[in-house]
Amino acid sequence: MIKVYNTLNKKKEEFIPLTPGEVKMYVCGPTVYNFFHIGNGRTFIVFDTIRRYFEYRGFKVDFVQNFTDIDDKMIKKANEEGTTVKKIGDTYIKEYYQDADALNIERATVNPRATEFIGEIIKFVKGLVDKGYAYEVDGDVYFSTKKFEGYGKLSGQNIEDLQSGARISVDERKKDPMDFAIWKAQKPGEPAWNSPWGMGRPGWHIECSCMAKKLLGETIDIHAGGSDLKFPHHENEIAQSEALTGEPFARYWLHSAFVNVNNEKMSKSLNNFFTAREILERYDADVIRFLMLSAHYRQQLNFSEDLLESAKASVERIYNAIGNLENLIDEVSREEMNEEEKAYLESLNKYKEKYIEKMDDDFNTADAITAIFDLIKDTNTNITIDSSKELAQKALELIRELGAPLGMFQKSTKGNLEEEIEALIAKRQQARKDRDFALADKIRDELKDRGIVLEDTPQGVRWKMI
């Protein structure tokens, strides 16, 4: 049984899909006017992992993640660069895929662009106007929040409190300060489409509501995104979607926490961000994913070079174990397991059970990773040159099986690990000859930190995993 923390009801709930064995999941994607930063990247990695885990548990997942390709920021960027909004969108959608692929983020079932749904959006807006939930002023169309009972139920705020909130724009033409634009009249220099209210473009909130409804249906299983989208974006999506259809919009709402730098939220507006591409130039995707999944997805994560280095060392420990098993598979002479080994292999299932228990509990990736470390500690100790090829192979398959939903630990180290260690040993031997004992000790300690111990023997230096 999978339990998820439902932001809507402020508690963990058993996940029961609308259709048995299927998950309809919508995740708010990027506004494509720039490269995405690692704070956005955490959101994409988290929900990629959750999608993978549902699939691991046997669900068929329809996973939709949109591109916002018409927006104030995109218009500003296009005007600054003397190009069109479409060209800006085309460019940064391509760049998104490059970076997301590099982070081993699986492609969505569908990545809709808002501009591909203008006709559907106009129908959606007209439906709200016809039902009395929206009104037109000078070519702009606003959603009337007071008409929708329960506005504020996601963010847990009442409408009176929200009216004085700092994020609400003041416009005297609106009937209420809380009302928000679902269609915007054209301004000079802006792209626009013909509508019953004149030339204009959609508001941001209406885009996701429309795409989710069109691609997944009136009620979906999971709507997800960063916690900064809870209000007003997701609150407004609920209001306009449920006002139009009369049905619950999403049964479960999942939100990932911020990535912070110096205890401040990472954001482009604060100029304290690092793009995913910048980090990928220096660290492997497994390292970045490890860091992003090393804390529970609802827990804020501080981003620093030290934490990246720590994640790198942790990933290396796991790949050292993988490399050790790969080498044993090549080196051991006995093919099949004996009865004792079969019993030992069966005992390793306790780590898989612990992993599933933790992931079933609102996708606790941090504790699931701990289960993988416990597994490799066991295999490093008990699978040796005297073991069978079959046992080493089965243990390796189990490590990879548990790593797959996390999007990690799938690469082969064959040849690379041994060559790297032998090169470091040779460097250490030369340092000792040169009487540079500080360097020799540093190399020994570095190898030890990676789970490799050196033994000086009459035949030379040997190494083994611990």
Curated annotation (Swiss-Prot):
Coiled coil: none
GO biological process: cysteinyl-tRNA aminoacylation
Family annotation (InterPro entries): Cys-tRNA-ligase, Cys-tRNA-synt_Ia_DALR, Cys-tRNA/MSH_ligase, CysS_C, Rossmann-like_a/b/a_fold, tRNA-synt_1_cat_dom, tRNAsynth_Ia_anticodon-bd
Keywords of the record: Aminoacyl-tRNA synthetase, ATP-binding, Cytoplasm, Ligase, Metal-binding, Nucleotide-binding, Protein biosynthesis, Zinc
Cofactor needs: Zn(2+)
Subunit structure: Monomer.
Official protein name in the record: Cysteine--tRNA ligase
Gene source species: Clostridium perfringens (strain 13 / Type A)
Highest classification ranks of the organism: Bacteria, Bacillati, Bacillota, Clostridia, Eubacteriales
Encoding gene per record: cysS
